[in-house]
Amino acid sequence: MIEVVLNPGEVSLSDWKAVYRGAPARLNESAGPVIAQSAAAVERILAKGAPVYGINTGFGKLASVRIGDADLETLQRNIVLSHAAGTGAPSPVAVIRLMMALKLASLAQGASGVRPATTDLLEAMIVKGLTPVVPCQGSVGASGDLAPLAHMAATMIGVGEIFVEGQRLPAVQALMEAGLKPLTLGPKEGLALLNGTQFSTANALAALFDAERLFQSALVTGALATEAAKGSDTPFDPRIHTLRRQPGQIETAAALRALMAGSAIRDSHREGDTRVQDPYCLRCQPQVMGAALDILRQAAVTLSTEANGVSDNPLIFPDTDEALSGGNFHAEPVAFAADIIALAVCEIGSIAERRIAMLVDPACSGLPAFLTPKPGLNSGFMIPQVTAAALVSENKQKAYPASVDSIPTSANQEDHVSMAAHGARRLLAMVEAAEAVIGIELLAAVQGCDFHAPLASSPALESVRGLLRAQVPHLSDDRHFHPDMEAANALVRSGAVVAAASSVELPGVEG
């Protein structure tokens, strides 16, 4: 993989995606002097002797407690240890690696007051594949993602555990074996590592990247389902969508037309078809999927901005030697973005399930009942459709907005929170469930198209059919269905379905 060079404040979504997918990453060397200037400013601010939150005071409700100079290092160590209070299963390594890169890029903007030695260690851990074990639960998304980031910071001072090539090692051992040493934190550094929205943002970005692949896969399987049901491509006529002016809808309709272009199945019923209009699950794909695309893009803009911003507190301004307290740690923008991603993922799966239900119903599709040549003796796709319905219903429950569920913390000092971490963390599970639905639709749509032999679909869709049939044969009689579903899921999840249809350019979240 090509190395990603992080230019603080200017990292593209495609670069963040590459980091999430495992690309090596490092800071632009030009960031070094900026970081050093910020650390020097902290020393000058301390020399003035005035109380400054988080540098020589307590934290949260204890902000009024003044800390003496002799205890400043202990203060920073204590905040890391006391705040490493997360619970639950370890977060995915890919997500935490992205979180580390986000934190590194934020610190490198010179507004957090950390020393170059601190960013050097964090960068080295990313480069050497040392990923802290971070429990997935415990953040309310303000004041930042304190508990998750504390678990990251703890490993930097030799406490906690680190994943190294799949092994879970004590932090000190992992650092030493990689030729690294634990830090002694300086003034402000513990708070700077803990305070920020990087855990929430990493989870939301990871889901956004996976949701983009989900969206594109669903366009392909939706086109295949339209072919299987001998649906019309007339609803995808550009004149219809131009009049509405919704950009995602226009692009989605164009993609569906391109996916079906050159189909003998479609040409076989252009004339003499007594059906006037297809069901909404076919006909309204541009409207539903286009709306999903538009809000995924809206979320992408918000998350890209957040990923390139600084969400620490207080913020250090070296030009004036000021430390200003504010609320950039409040992750409301991330929470809102996560909520709309959840809506998009939910609806992508929902309309796909309706297409599956349509295909297995002979009254709607004109195909054999449950897509089996011998219905009754065989149950065919009866229960896979039930599984799809179950997954869609689970996602509907998870799509409830997290951002409206604030709860006071820290003795009411932190009395309104974003719940961004929960809102973002649920998304990967939602995408995984929706991918399973799309995998079932892939199986059902290809099975349905098989009944139209010797007629073929379009070149793009035939490529996808061939991809599936290389692993999963036509279902003539009932067999153990789970392996077929797992194979189809893997093709969706890996991006192979989208790659097989790559002769058609599919819209993505970056426009």
Curated annotation (Swiss-Prot):
Post-translational modification: Contains an active site 4-methylidene-imidazol-5-one (MIO), which is formed autocatalytically by cyclization and dehydration of residues Ala-Ser-Gly.
CDD domains (alphabetical): PAL-HAL
2,3-didehydroalanine (Ser) found at: S143
Localization in the cell: Cytoplasm
Catalytic activity field: L-histidine = trans-urocanate + NH4(+)
Keyword Protein biosynthesis listed: no
Keyword Magnesium: no
Gene Ontology cellular-component annotations: cytoplasm
Gene3D superfamilies found in the cross-reference section: Fumarase/aspartase (Central domain), Fumarase/aspartase (N-terminal domain)
Keywords: Cytoplasm, Histidine metabolism, Lyase
Lineage top rank: taxon: Bacteria
Gene Ontology process terms (BP): L-histidine catabolic process to glutamate and formamide; L-histidine catabolic process to glutamate and formate
Pathway(s) annotated for this protein in UniProt: Amino-acid degradation; L-histidine degradation into L-glutamate; N-formimidoyl-L-glutamate from L-histidine: step 1/3
Listed GO MF terms: histidine ammonia-lyase activity
EC number: 4.3.1.3
Pfam families: Lyase_aromatic
5-imidazolinone (Ala-Gly), cross-linked positions: A142-G144
PANTHER family cross-referenced by the UniProt entry: HISTIDINE AMMONIA-LYASE
Family membership noted in the UniProt record: Belongs to the PAL/histidase family.
Protein name: Histidine ammonia-lyase
